[in-house]
């Protein structure tokens, strides 16, 4: 993971709260005490009194806890320094800010500092005549029952479920004791296991880690505290999920089994990003978890996936399961109730909406099929020559892929070479499957356009597909009865003109156009295929000294584009690859 950090003195909690309130109307900040509360929950606000919920803890776990202040969730939060409990005074300030005649429930994660400070604040509030109860969230299963018998389970992902479910119960009018029971029922039936590739970086502090570059840790806490064990080499997400679930269900060691789950139980699943995982990988992990649960006969009735309880930028994720069948009877009603809390980043869905996933299967639809014209176009092609040309193009793609990728890593996003390889593999498969009409000059090229469109992503895939589609149309418009150099020259010009309708790139803009435009122009000047191929190469080479005008490379610093002085400069990867392909095509067609 990257250990670069913004320069910081570490004092960022207060401005964070102000920024949160600025972007979420209805919240008020007590700056001095680093407390944020729901404005409508304050005494005298005019709202009907209800049981209020107060939580908090060390900062660095955002959106927990402050992000869960809102209608149908928490009413106030006291924020400590990064990974440090707030003081008793801060917590008492939060309690006073939302004091209610209906009473207040304090929700705290089960960590020693939090328990002490929130417990003391609760006792002070009781002494002052306030009606308060406290519940401690402990859902971690990585530390077994024997080892953790004295301190109990740590509070992890289930914390936000307690915030939301208890908060909704309070919003619906339950009394303090009932709300506390709802919260406790979620805690008692929750199990969480987390894993991370590394420690997180704390603002204002030097990054430190005891994990090697090929190690990961199961059970790492949300304060950089050590996990239960390290392992290597780095796993795939499916491998890691298998390992995590075996611990959560006590399959690896019964001592880690705190909650029983069966195929008959209604379950809530939460897959939590610890802060540094990409949304793409998190969504992948969510599907992997769901698939592996299904193999155990467990189909969650509600699934949450997102960033809820973090360890700053921790590169890991957690899996939380709640056995809803053993929790409060109305748990799904409370779960589904809308909330304004920004941290509950789950789109609102009612119970009926969730029914579509009741069998555990995501609704899918078949791919839209391309209906192709099966009638021969009337333009003959030599199947052997067509095949030879295509194979030569694929061979060139594979041969020059490493260099294309290297160039694109410097000047772009590094996918130019692999994108072309994907297209080449699809073309090879189509040749073997006989799904390209190699005897048809129009339909065969049109087939290629669809293959490229389906297999090549990114800008280059779109450009190749447009060009090939127009090339097929150009062959048809030529009026020729069989493919020839003349036909190809006419169609190439037709295709280039079509391509120019969809891109502003022209020769000299440092794109693949610098290879294809000279090729087409030279061919249409009647100078032959060899001269056209040479022009494509020369056009590609000229990009080594050009500044990018369009495309991703236009955002890259000029000094990056001129790095490879030993080669005469850095060429445009797309032009470099296309020139190689065109040269291979010409060579194959003439020998």
UniProtKB/Swiss-Prot annotation:
DhaL domain sequence ranges: 384-587
Role description: Catalyzes both the phosphorylation of dihydroxyacetone and of glyceraldehyde.
Sites where the protein binds substrate: 58-61, 109, 114
Keyword Disulfide bond: no
Protein name in the entry: Dihydroxyacetone kinase 2
Miscellaneous field: Seems to be missing in strain 972.
GO BP: glycerol catabolic process; glycerol metabolic process
Superkingdom in the source lineage: Eukaryota
Source organism: Schizosaccharomyces pombe (strain 972 / ATCC 24843) (Fission yeast)
Domain DhaK: 8-344
Matches recorded under InterPro entries: DhaK_ATP, DhaK_dom, DhaL_dom, DhaL_dom_sf, Dihydroxyacetone_Kinase
Keyword Transferase set for record: yes
Assigned GO CC terms: cytoplasm; cytosol
Family indicated by similarity: Belongs to the dihydroxyacetone kinase (DAK) family.
Active-site residues per Swiss-Prot or TrEMBL entry: 223 (tele-hemiaminal-histidine intermediate)
Enzymatic reactions: dihydroxyacetone + ATP = dihydroxyacetone phosphate + ADP + H(+); D-glyceraldehyde + ATP = D-glyceraldehyde 3-phosphate + ADP + H(+)
Protein encoded by which gene: dak2
Coiled-coil portions: none
GO molecular function, a single term: glycerone kinase activity
Entry keyword set: ATP-binding, Glycerol metabolism, Kinase, Nucleotide-binding, Transferase
PROSITE patterns: DHAK, DHAL
Pathway(s) per entry: Polyol metabolism; glycerol fermentation; glycerone phosphate from glycerol (oxidative route): step 2/2
Xref: Gene3D superfamilies: 1.25.40.340, Dihydroxyacetone kinase, domain 1 (3.40.50.10440), Dihydroxyacetone kinase, domain 2 (3.30.1180.20)
EC annotation from Swiss-Prot or TrEMBL: 2.7.1.28, 2.7.1.29
UniProt-listed PANTHER family: TRIOKINASE/FMN CYCLASE (PTHR28629), TRIOKINASE_FMN CYCLASE (PTHR28629:SF4)
Residues the record lists as binding ATP: 413-416, 459-460, 511-512, 572-574
One Pfam family in the UniProt entry: Dak1
């Amino acid at each position: 993971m990257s250990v670069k950090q913004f320069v910081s003195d570490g004092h960022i909690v207060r401005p964070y709260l102000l920024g949160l309130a600025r972007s979420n109307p209805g919240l008020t900040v007590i700056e001095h005490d680093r407390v944020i509360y729901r404005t409508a929950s304050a005494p005298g606000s005019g709202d009907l009194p209800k049981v209020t919920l107060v939580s908090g803890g060390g900062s660095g776990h955002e959106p927990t806890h402050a992000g869960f202040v809102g209608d149908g969730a928490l009413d106030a939060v006291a924020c400590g320094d990064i990974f440090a409990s707030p003081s008793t005074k801060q917590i008492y300030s939060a309690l006073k800010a939302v004091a209610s005649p209906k009473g207040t429930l304090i929700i705290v994660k089960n960590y020693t500092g939090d328990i002490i400070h929130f417990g003391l604040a609760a006792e002070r509030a009781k002494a002052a005549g306030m009606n308060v109860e406290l519940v401690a969230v402990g859902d971690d299963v990585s530390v077994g029952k024997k080892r953790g018998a004295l301190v109990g389970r740590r509070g992890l992902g289930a914390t936000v479920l307690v915030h939301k479910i208890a908060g909704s119960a309070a919003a619906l009018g339950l009394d303090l004791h009932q709300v506390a029971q709802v919260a406790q029922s979620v805690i008692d039936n929750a199990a969480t296991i987390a894993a991370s590739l590394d420690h997180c970086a704390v603002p204002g502090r030097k990054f430190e880690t005891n994990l090697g570059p090929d190690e990961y840790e199961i059970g790492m806490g949300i304060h950089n505290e050590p996990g239960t064990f390290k392992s290597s080499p780095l796993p795939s997400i499916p491998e890691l999920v298998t390992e995590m679930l075996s611990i959560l269900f006590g399959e690896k060691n019964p001592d880690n089994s705190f909650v029983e789950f069966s195929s008959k139980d209604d379950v809530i699943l939460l897959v939590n990003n610890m802060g540094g995982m990409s949304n793409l990988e998190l969504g992948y992990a969510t599907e992997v978890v769901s698939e592996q649960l299904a193999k155990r006969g467990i189909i969650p009735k509600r699934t949450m996936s997102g960033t809820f309880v973090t360890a700053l930028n921790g590169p890991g994720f957690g899996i939380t399961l709640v056995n809803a069948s053993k929790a409060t009877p109305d748990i799904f009603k409370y779960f589904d109730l809308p909330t304004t809390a920004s941290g509950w980043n789950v789109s609102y869905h009612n119970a009926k909406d969730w029914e579509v996933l009741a069998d555990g299967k995501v609704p899918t639809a078949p791919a839209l099929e391309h209906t192709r014209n099966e009638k021969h176009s009337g333009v003959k092609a030599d199947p052997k020559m067509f095949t030879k040309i295509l194979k030569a193009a694929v061979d060139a793609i594979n041969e020059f892929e490493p260099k294309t990728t290297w160039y694109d890593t410097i000047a772009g996003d590094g996918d130019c070479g692999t994108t072309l390889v994907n297209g080449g593999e699809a073309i090879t498969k189509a040749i073997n499957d006989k799904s390209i009409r190699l005897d048809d000059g129009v339909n065969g090229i049109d087939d290629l356009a669809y293959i490229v469109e389906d297999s090549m992503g990114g800008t280059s895939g779109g450009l190749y597909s447009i060009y090939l589609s127009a090339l097929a149309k150009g062959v048809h418009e030529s009026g020729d009865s069989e493919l020839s150099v003349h036909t190809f020259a006419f169609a190439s010009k037709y295709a280039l003109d079509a391509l120019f309708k969809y891109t502003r790139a022209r020769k000299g803009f440092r794109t693949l156009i610098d290879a294809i435009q000279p090729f087409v122009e030279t061919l249409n000047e009647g100078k032959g295929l060899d001269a056209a191929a040479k022009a494509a190469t020369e056009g590609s080479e000229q990009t080594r000294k050009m500044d990018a005008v369009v495309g991703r490379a236009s955002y890259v610093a000029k000094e990056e584009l001129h790095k490879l002085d030993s080669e005469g400069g850095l060429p445009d990867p797309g032009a470099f690859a296309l020139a190689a392909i065109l040269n291979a095509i010409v060579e194959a067609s003439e020998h």
